[in-house]
Amino acid sequence: MFMSDLHSHHVNLRLVTKYRVSAEFPDVPGTPSLLFDERPPLGDGRGPNAAMVLGAAIGDCLSATLMNCLIRAHVDVEALTATVVTRVARNHAGRFRISGIEVELCPTVPPSERAGLERCQVIFQDYCTVTESVREGIRVTVSLTQPASDNGNVGTPVAATENPV
């Protein structure tokens, strides 16, 4: 089933040097840019790479979704931590792929409110936009375009691909 877009989020990326890329978030004014970099030997490791950020996005979404459920259930959350491990392995063609993501959420709630935590444990993941989208597979469309020239010509499309989901 194809979903109609309700929201869209924009990220602008700019090459800084070699494998280092700066990401800006124009939808959130005042947000500092995020620097991505590949681990050595490709990059210098001066920032997280895309696999790390994917893990962080899933961990953040699960944390926020759990908090939303607990708040709605009137559970007093004293603390919440999350640990995410993103595993990378080679596929059958020898190319690196994300082979799994493990998330451990550790909420601290008073013993008297454990029943609310247990109720949320059953349902909260279904409401996590990022995690459930990754689990289902996300349609990704990629286009490769030559930038506009200095004389004002419009960018020239080179190629476009889309994965079937």
Question: Where are the predicted features?
Answer:
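Extended beta-strand/beta-hairpin segments
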Residues: 1-56, 67-165
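Alpha-helical metal-binding/catalytic segments enriched in His/Glu/Asp
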Residues: 61-62
